[in-house]
């Protein structure tokens, strides 16, 4: 079966996706799709599972702003064997919590063989604020973005970092918070993820290198009423391991196409929640002729369907069905021929 196609798996962050709205719960979807394509491109929201991760050699870990630039044709993706990852820690993190994250960094070097530069603490607390939009999506702001960018600049220019992992102190939701309770029970929006995207976007936009974020939070009280989807966030002090692993093999972003790089013209399929079709990357790739596969059972807080934007999409119920579409098209089999009824040919 041909497997030289390229697919982009999108699950936008902070919109309450039923699959991919939690820490790493879309990894099984990525694993499955990676088996039927030559290259899978996706983003940290899909692949970050807090302390859990899954290596996939043909899967590229690309930050959201970089995905938008890639889809527009402004950037191309260059595979690498490894990146030297710089760790940028928020000055607002308490000493004990800071030490926990340094231990993760040391463990990733000793246990996984990752290459890290010396770390840096920002010169000011970054002070993150969290918000929820009227649509129910989460977002946030960073009070001191200049401190974030100064820290990243030093890691790049003084420590030769090729990718940046950021850990910032996030506000704590009280355990009795309805938002937090809903999320822990598998039926809410991640209140952190929208702000996380802002942090990584700033670095990627300014420096053009891979970046991803892990929040620093105190462990929550133990509870027996935790959804399996939220459980990855309950098992430790840190979300950093999967970020370091992802960045260690993240492709570099280049502005001049090379023969062995990947461009937006190479993307054959875009798989997205059916109700979240308004993103820049999807719109760009749809206009270039990529096959859009809209998954209906991955419900989100959004209501932006492909038909309302004039996008021709193949609607499927599940990711299992989405894989079937990819396999059949890769094999040159008409989708219509797989159904119980086939319409007659008409004379032009």
Which positions does each model-derived feature cover?
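C-terminal functional extensions of proteins
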Residues: 218-222, 239-269, 273-348
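Short, hinge-like loop/turn segments at secondary-structure boundaries
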Residues: 58-61, 229-231, 311-312
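Hydrophobic beta-strand scaffold residues
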Residues: 40, 116, 210-211, 292
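Metallocofactor- and cofactor-centric catalytic cores in central/energy metabolism, strongly enriched
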Residues: 1-180, 189-193
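Anion (oxyanion) recognition and catalysis
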Residues: 34-35, 204-205, 286
């Amino acid at each position: 079966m041909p497997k030289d196609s390229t697919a982009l798996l999108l699950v936008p962050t902070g919109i309450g996706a039923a699959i991919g709205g939690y820490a790493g719960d879309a990894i099984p979807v990525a694993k499955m799709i990676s088996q039927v394509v030559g290259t899978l491109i996706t983003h940290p929201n899909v692949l970050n599972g807090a302390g859990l991760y899954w290596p996939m050699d043909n899967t590229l870990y690309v930050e959201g702003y970089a995905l938008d630039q890639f889809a527009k044709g402004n950037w191309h993706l260059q595979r690498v064997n490894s990146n030297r990852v710089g760790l940028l820690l928020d000055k607002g993190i308490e000493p004990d919590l800071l030490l926990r994250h340094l231990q993760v960094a040391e463990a990733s070097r000793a246990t996984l063989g990752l290459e890290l530069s010396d770390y840096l603490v920002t010169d000011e607390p970054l002070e993150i604020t969290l918000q929820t939009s009227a649509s129910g999506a989460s977002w946030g702001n960073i009070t001191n973005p200049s401190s974030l960018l100064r820290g990243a600049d030093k890691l790049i220019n003084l420590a030769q970092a090729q990718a940046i992992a950021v850990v910032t102190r996030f506000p704590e939701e009280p355990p009795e918070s309805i938002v937090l309770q809903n999320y822990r029970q598998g039926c809410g929006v991640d209140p952190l993820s929208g702000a996380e995207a802002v942090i990584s976007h700033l670095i990627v936009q300014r420096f053009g290198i891979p970046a991803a974020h892990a929040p620093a939070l105190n462990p929550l009280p133990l509870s027996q009423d935790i959804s399996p989807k939220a459980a990855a966030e309950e098992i430790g002090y840190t979300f950093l391991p999967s970020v370091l692993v992802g960045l260690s093999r993240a492709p570099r972003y280049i502005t001049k196409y090379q023969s062995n790089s990947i461009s937006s013209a190479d993307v054959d399929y875009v798989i997205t929640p059916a109700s979240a079709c308004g993103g820049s990357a999807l719109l760009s790739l749809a206009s270039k002729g990529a096959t859009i596969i809209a998954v209906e059972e991955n419900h989100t807080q959004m209501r932006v369907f492909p038909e309302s934007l004039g996008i021709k999409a193949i609607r499927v119920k599940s990711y299992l069905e989405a894989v079937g579409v990819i396999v059949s098209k890769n094999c040159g089999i008409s989708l219509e021929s797989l159904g119980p009824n086939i319409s007659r040919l008409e004379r032009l």
